[in-house]
Structure formats: structure tokens, C-alpha cells
Amino acid sequence: MEKINENIFHQYNKWKQGYSRKENSFKQRVQNFLSNREDADIYSISKDSKYLNAYYNVVIHDEDIRDGKLPVPFGEIRGDFECSRCDSLISLEGAPKRVDRKFECYNCPSLTSLEGAPKEVGWLFSCKRCTSLTSLVGAPEESRDFFDCSSCDSLISLEGAPKKVGKNFNCSKCKNLLSLEGAPKELGGAFDCSDCENLTSLVGVPKKIHGYFDCSGCENLTSLEYLPKEIAGDLYIGKRFKGKIPEDVIVKGVIQYE
């Protein structure tokens, strides 16, 4: 019995020491991050001492990145959060849990996944021109404003995209995108999938578009069979589809043959 109690006591002390080291490590990382920042006064540490919060805009530069990750784990951001143009960023581990306005991680050529991205974003979410991004899994389930994943050369599917987007959804110029399945089911604005040269079908697009719909420049698109049933704005399609729009499709704007 004494041996068991000794083991429990030993394990407790070991855990306590480990927890203390982790806590000190977090504080050291925060100190290192804030030491050369002129905006250090906008930050605060969460009550559980696990996250760094901010009540204004946060901009992360490539020199802030540590081992391919964000410098500290962030919690709630009361403004914008940007970690764009960070060539060495590999992972969004440590990204904020919530961003009140914009979250931008565009032009990060080494980023391969959105795992770790905020679950709540108030305005825009942009991961455009992340040329190594292979999946949208990890993106927030809802983007209240715009969602932009355009020019992501390695993206082959929209699986993982938000289920609901308040305004526009842009997946244009994704040259290896093979399918639109996984696209938002609810959309409050335009849908742009133009210049996706390997796209062969419109399967997966929302049935109703509240802005323009652009599928021009998709040279391998073979059919307009799954075109949205109602388009509130203009429709942009290739010249080869002139006169081939399904009769049950309502376009309230102008049909533009690109």
C-alpha cells in the first residue's frame, strides 16, 4: 500500500512540475513575441493562462513564425487577424479561436492545411494564393461575409468549405480543382469558380445565387446541367454554351458570354 501511495505522490509531483514548465514556456513565448512590438498594450493573457487575446488588429510577419507555426496560441481577437505572406508558415496551429472581423492567411506558399483555423469569423476569411493548400478541412462552418480560396493551385476539392457564407464565395483560378462538391449550401452573394481549367461539372453549386455566377474560363466544363436554378445577378459563361442554358434556370441579370 505504501508503494502505491508513493507512486501516486511521485506521479502528482511529476505532473505538477510538467504543468509548471508548460506554463512558464507559454509565458516566455508571449514575452518573446511582445518584446519588440509597439502594440503590446492591446494584448492580454486569458484567465486560464493558455491563450493570448487582443482587442484590436493583429498582424503576424514571417519573422514571427517559429518552427513553421504561429509564435503563441491566440484566443479571442476583437479585430482582424492576419498572418499573410508568411513563407515559412506550415500550420495554423495556435490560430485564434474567434476573430470578430477578418482572418487572412493568404500568400502562404508552405501552408498545406486549414486545421487549427478559427471556428468563428465575423467578416472575411481568406486563404487565397496558398499554393500548397490541398484541403479546406478546418475552415469555419460559417463565414458571415466573404470566403476566398482562389488561386490555390493544389486544391482539388471544396470539401471542408463553410456550409454557410453571408456574401461571396470565390474559388476561381484553382487550376487543379476537380469538383465543386462541398461548396456552401447557403450563400448570400456571388459564386465565382471561373478559370478552373480542370473542372468538368457544376455538381455541388448552391441552387440559388443572390449575386453573380461566374464559370467562365473553365475550358473542360462539359455541361450546364447543374447550373443554379436562380441567379439574382449576371451569369458569366463560355461562348460555346450560347443558347444552351437550361430552360428551368432563371437569370435576373445579364448573360455574359466570355
Which residues does each predicted region cover?
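Helix-centric, low-specificity signal for extended rod-like, repetitive segments
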Residues: 9, 20-22, 90, 112, ...
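Leucine-rich repeat
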Residues: 46-49, 69-73, 92-94, 115-116, ...
